[in-house]
């Protein structure tokens, strides 16, 4: 079973061609909202009030850089929370006090610029991380931000020299020994736009997804990930020939990109070119015999067939190889509950809660656990 995949980052691969020939504006209606990456660092009135009030006071007490770092820390003034549920600009991240790593980096950079610090961005190589949303499967990248060296600021009545300090919203243990690569700010903006395209796709907003990914490509034509996203957008829109062109562009620069290969195989199958699609499927099976969500999809199929024991075994395989992904624990809990193994199901639900990274998932799993515990107490 082939799945539609989006990738978040390919920092080491640069596209060396003009993206406009791949675009097809006339095929799509106007977007339902403004599509603009130029203002993602803009401070809202609430952010400006924070800079001039609470942050000003903290900086005068602790210094420019240390004041901001402490405000952003886990137990700091802002009390930020990691939430993988969506990508936000600086203002929305500040308002919600939460966001994914890219959203939190954008907000941090906005504050740093406002108080006179320079910023530098890094793409960090982490172990492959996957998620799914709305029938779309995502390969998740990671970025962080470094607050600059030898920058002075008189705004707060200080003349201060600071050293580079990297702000990262993953636990230190998750980053130990990982390599990073400097990326320009235009890449951060393109990542934001590409993420918004993927989120629009997952929500069924194919038209808006096109305009988001178009903006990403024009913002940073060298960034490979949006070309793959564009292929998925075209396929969802029924523009199969355009989808093939976009995906073959990805493969021109990364011939063994598993996500683009999988997406292209789906497109070729849709076009009725089964021999070509099967050749790609054989190549994919050689590159990765059991790709991400391989056992998961089989587990869902077993549940639909009311074969709970088989579903349990498939979900257990996914938990064994990727125990930090919440959905595997949740669906294993479903299969176990269907089999009457309530204690084991409760244990898996607790693990789903512990590993969830989105507020909506956390609320769902907590409600399921409460219901399961209530049913147990009733009996």
List PLM regions with ranges:
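Canonical positions in the second alpha-helix
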Residues: 215-216, 249-250, 281-284, 317-318, ...
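Secondary-structure boundary elements
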Residues: 30-93
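Long, contiguous interaction/recruitment modules in multidomain scaffold/adaptor proteins
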Residues: 85-227, 241-253
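Canonical tetratricopeptide repeat
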Residues: 195, 229, 263, 296-297, ...
